[in-house]
């Protein structure tokens, strides 16, 4: 069982989408099932509507979940299992105030050493705990051995006990921390494999330790994906537009192209252009590079053009909101535009009233009048050109530039001989606008 567990705290990052896609593909390969879990326990950072937005984005990418969980609905289980850890002496109540901890952290920094919890409250007797009326958090007891796990991408990874430390699992307000809620939910929901970003590597031993202390013996496999770098070779910030899946979709990149690119990123694939469904046939998580991958927006633009070319008429109607008769024209314009909006603008320009530059106005009118006189437009552009040049005596720039403006509303663009067959049936309507 695989899962994708985003938090509704902002726009979905492409790194998160990449993890969702990989988990989904692997769940289809072994038919184990796919869970979507909205991790909403950080109420201070939650943004209204983001949970639904996450679901809508996944649907656009064709990602279907077998089960949906809302993490906050598991709060009673989090508290029950935290209580079990206390009873089993695997966890303890910590009454240290924020001010006390801040002072200890400052002292450690001044001494040039990493801060570690000093175990003050772990030493308290049961009676001392009961008699203390101060607010408290619950901490796990630090492990007494190296915690190791085998990463499906990075290989074996180990963490010394001091790097695990006595970490907090329940806050003062009795809500679970990320690591505790995540560890418990994965256990309760039967998750068997987790694919996520490498920023979670240090969380994995903590989550494994929590489950071990709870007596859970089922193994969960992990794969941690290298980070995605921006085009400057730096870690991609959430503030960068291209890191937001919502922004990419609104900018005119197709879900098919984005998925294609994210699967291709840092991966060895048998071909360059493919769909998510096609990737299910050959995807291998172990072949993902251990090194960070650099995001290349121009490569994504190329893939966007390729997926527009591959799309059937029904899909193009859905994406562009244009009649099916425009399908070939849409594909034609991928030779000079990559985004949905750019292509729509070029087509809109053809079928709108033209702004004619004064220097071409006279020749445009001459060409328009002659085109409207032609009873039946010829099949090919050469014959069309021959008819017009004979009738108007216009040549070279005086012919081609006004004709291009009359037909497309643009000074530059694709070869008219290639565009003509696609517009032929509509040309009289176009010039009459």
From Swiss-Prot:
One of its GO terms (biological process) is glutamyl-tRNA aminoacylation. Keywords: Aminoacyl-tRNA synthetase, ATP-binding, Cytoplasm, Ligase, Nucleotide-binding, Protein biosynthesis. It is an enzyme of class 6 (ligase). SUPFAM superfamilies: An anticodon-binding domain of class I aminoacyl-tRNA synthetases, Nucleotidylyl transferase. It catalyses: tRNA(Glu) + L-glutamate + ATP = L-glutamyl-tRNA(Glu) + AMP + diphosphate. A motif ('HIGH' region) lies at residues 6-16. Its main location: cytoplasm. Monomer. This is Glutamate--tRNA ligase 2.
């Amino acid at each position: 069982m695989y899962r994708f567990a985003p938090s509704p705290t902002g726009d979905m990052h492409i790194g998160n989408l990449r993890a969702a896609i990989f988990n989904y593909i692997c769940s289809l390969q072994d038919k184990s099932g796919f869970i979507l879990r909205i991790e909403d326990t950080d109420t201070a950072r939650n943004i209204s509507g983001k949970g639904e937005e996450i679901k809508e984005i996944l649907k656009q990418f064709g990602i279907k979940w077998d089960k949906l969980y809302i993490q906050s609905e598991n709060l009673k289980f989090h508290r029950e299992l935290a209580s079990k850890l206390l009873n089993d002496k695997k966890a303890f109540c910590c009454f240290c105030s924020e001010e006390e901890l801040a002072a200890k952290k400052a002292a450690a920094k001044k001494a040039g050493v990493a801060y570690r919890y000093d175990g003050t409250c772990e030493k308290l007797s049961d009676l001392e705990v009961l008699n203390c009326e101060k607010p408290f958090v619950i901490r796990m007891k630090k492990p007494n051995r190296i915690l190791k796990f085998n990463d499906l991408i990075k290989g074996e990874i180990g963490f010394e006990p001091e790097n695990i430390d006595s970490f907090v699992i329940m806050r003062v307000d009795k809500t679970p921390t990320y690591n505790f809620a995540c560890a418990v939910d994965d256990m309760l929901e039967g998750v068997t494999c987790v694919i996520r970003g490498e920023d979670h590597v240090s969380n994995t031993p903590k989550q494994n330790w929590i489950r071990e202390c709870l007596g859970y013996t089922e193994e969960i496999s992990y794969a941690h994906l290298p980070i995605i770098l921006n085009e400057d070779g730096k870690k991609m910030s959430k503030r960068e537009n291209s890191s937001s899946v919502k922004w990419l979709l609104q900018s005119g990149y197709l879900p098919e192209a984005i998925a294609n690119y994210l699967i291709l990123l840092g991966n060895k694939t048998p071909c360059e252009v493919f769909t998510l469904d096609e990737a299910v046939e050959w995807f291998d998580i172990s072949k993902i590079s251990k090194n960070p991958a650099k995001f290349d927006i121009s490569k994504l633009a190329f893939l966007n053009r390729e997926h527009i070319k591959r799309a059937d008429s029904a899909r193009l109607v859905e994406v562009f909101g244009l009649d099916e008769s425009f399908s070939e024209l849409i594909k034609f314009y991928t030779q000079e535009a990559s985004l949905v909006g750019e292509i729509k603008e070029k087509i809109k320009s053809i079928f709108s009233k033209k702004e004619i530059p004064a220097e071409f106005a006279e020749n445009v009118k001459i060409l328009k009048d002659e085109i409207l006189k032609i009873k039946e437009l010829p099949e090919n552009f050469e014959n069309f050109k021959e008819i017009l040049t004979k009738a108007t005596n216009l040549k070279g720039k005086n012919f081609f530039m006004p004709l291009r403006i009359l037909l497309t509303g643009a000074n530059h663009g694709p070869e008219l001989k290639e565009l003509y067959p696609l517009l032929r049936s509509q040309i009289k309507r176009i010039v009459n606008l």
